[in-house]
């Protein structure tokens, strides 16, 4: 079954709501790892609405599993990534007015820019993943620019209002996995996954890691980070 990358952005969201020092996302990362998280994910946004550069620097020194840095493919973010050197990077689209990431990257429509960013990062040994919708065009473009991974956007599946739509979206994700694998790409997934809907995605052939944040942090507010992470690990394995 896939491994679990715990996204701790929303621990920082709570902190930034009061512009104070707590809760500390670094402490949350430690607790998540102790509970069995296989990796820690953070999104350093251009508007710095939650995770701050200082957080990423400290996490780079303290995370014992692997650190996945989500970021927009901009010169500013590339410079930061080259300084910090996370274990791997997921390139994501970004709009300042969005509440959360609303869709996948348009890799096919920005091939030259994406190829340049991927080459810069992978040239210093940082594997790059492209956060994309499960569309053949975007998957093939990601292979064309020689990214190592893709992360399939699971939002449409997660937001499905009925079982028929959910099944349709799951089939699209499964097809995306197969296309990616046939093009030599490794496959992760994330966005909107919960304790209730994660298992079907976890069962997709070739799925390596699921990056999950909001639902874990939401549960952690009530039961603690360690229990929230342990229960997500169980959910991924169909035992929750």
From Swiss-Prot:
Chain sites annotated for binding 1-deoxy-D-xylulose 5-phosphate: 9-10, 45, 50, 100
Subcellular location: Cytoplasm
Record-annotated site: Transition state stabilizer: 151
Pathway: Cofactor biosynthesis; pyridoxine 5'-phosphate biosynthesis; pyridoxine 5'-phosphate from D-erythrose 4-phosphate: step 5/5
Reactions it catalyzes: 3-amino-2-oxopropyl phosphate + 1-deoxy-D-xylulose 5-phosphate = pyridoxine 5'-phosphate + phosphate + 2 H2O + H(+)
E.C. code: 2.6.99.2
GO biological process entries: pyridoxine biosynthetic process
Residues the entry annotates as binding 3-amino-2-oxopropyl phosphate: 7, 18, 192, 213-214
Broadest EC class assigned to this enzyme: transferase
Main localisation: cytoplasm
GO cellular component, one term: cytosol
A Pfam family of this chain: PdxJ
Active site, per annotation: 43 (proton acceptor), 70 (proton acceptor), 191 (proton donor)
Keyword field: Cytoplasm, Pyridoxine biosynthesis, Transferase
GO molecular function, one term: pyridoxine 5'-phosphate synthase activity
Flavoprotein recorded as keyword: no
Function as written in the Swiss-Prot or TrEMBL entry: Catalyzes the complicated ring closure reaction between the two acyclic compounds 1-deoxy-D-xylulose-5-phosphate (DXP) and 3-amino-2-oxopropyl phosphate (1-amino-acetone-3-phosphate or AAP) to form pyridoxine 5'-phosphate (PNP) and inorganic phosphate.
Family (UniProt): Belongs to the PNP synthase family.
PANTHER family linked to this entry: PYRIDOXINE 5'-PHOSPHATE SYNTHASE
Oligomer status and interactors: Homooctamer; tetramer of dimers.
Protein name in the entry: Pyridoxine 5'-phosphate synthase
High-level lineage: Bacteria, Bacillati, Cyanobacteriota, Cyanophyceae, Oscillatoriophycideae
